[in-house]
Amino acid sequence: MIDDSATTPNARNVSRRSAVGAMALFAAGLVMPAPSVLRRRYRLFAHSTTEYSERAIRLVRGTVVVDMLNQFRFADTAIRPPLSEQWKRKPNAFTAANWEEYRTSGFRVFGVGEGASSYDGALRTIAEWNGFVAAYPQWFIRVGGAEDFARLATDEKIGILLDFQNADHFRTVDDVDTFWGLGQRSSQLTYNQTNRLGSGFLAETDGGLTDYGAQIIARMQKVGMAVDLAHAADRTTLDALAAATKPVIVSHSACRAVAPGHLRAKTDEMIVKLAKLGGVMGIPMIRFMVKLDEPVTIENVLDHFDHVAKTVGVEHAGIGGDLDLVGNANPVNSAEAKQEIPSNQPNFDRYHFHAGPDGKLAVPGLDHPKRTYDLAEGLIRRKYSDADIGLMLGGNWRRVLSSIWGV
């Protein structure tokens, strides 16, 4: 659908409705120099001169924005242990000032995308996140059902969605039930290498989905846990799509048609089969995932949204940023950051890893906490309707996850 209602009016055409809207936004704490009021554009934060349209602000604030991979505050490599870990483990470490940064970001649901190298490690991670949410009930809820999305639509709290980036913690099929009961609502089958379920995209040989992997998918879909194929290799991805009987997801992956030759991206065949199952694919905001070389801009990210929309419909595209709140702010050429990059993995060159001139991994313009507004502006530029933008910002994730969890 095309919506040209975003055309900026000139000063003499400012309506009474616009003026009332401007006053409401001012009351919400926006910084609005007088000329910007007349153009219906507003500054969201004092430290930046970036201005956003009234339409973009309305869309973000009127949507439960879901990022299916946003690691909260994990990637500030100059701070060890990561702030996320400190906040989970130290009483009262998360402050009102920290909350304000999250509250004003535009994100409403964080898929925290933890690693699960073992059963015991996954239990510990789940316990820490459950403890964190319980420690700050005035600010956070754990998202595990459709009713939680409905709740977030009416209050200012933020949802924590417990998901893992592999399934190594499932020692037996019954462990799926155990972790569902503890709050886990999504799991990738594999990370980068081969495990008991299938092969990740860095595996030397893609052996496809194993019998055990098929059993895990069946149990996940029975209990209502989302099957995530983000890091799975090609044959494993296609096998899993064939084995699934209900919607599955790709939490964060680019389109191979837009980034040719990138094995971490999904082919059109995969995207079509995902859509036929009713699934959704999250578009990342990391330079080396959306384009094989520099320069990279937000327009390259938008190209992936466009490709999914044109191939299977806007109903199957969402956000899967693969960043933390502040956009993985530290340059990767810092000593601390180099320790966090798993470049010693076999076949790491398949990532086509590269950073910008500033050493940062996040796409410029999407490298800050309020990037949801920049994404909304970009989708407006691409002439999507308000309804379609709302779907891509969060409505699609809300629909598919509610369906999966509602078994």
Language model feature labels by segment:
Residues V14-T205, P260-G282, I286-V407:
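N-terminal hydrophobic targeting/anchoring segments and the immediately downstream early-domain regions
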Residues D168-F170, T178-R264:
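Divalent metal-binding pocket/active-site signature
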Residues M1-V14, R40-R41:
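N-terminal secretory signal peptides
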Residues A11, R219, A244-K246, I380-Y384:
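Secondary-structure boundary/capping motif
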Residues A6, N10-A11, P33, T63, ...:
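A general, composition-driven signal for non-globular sequence regions
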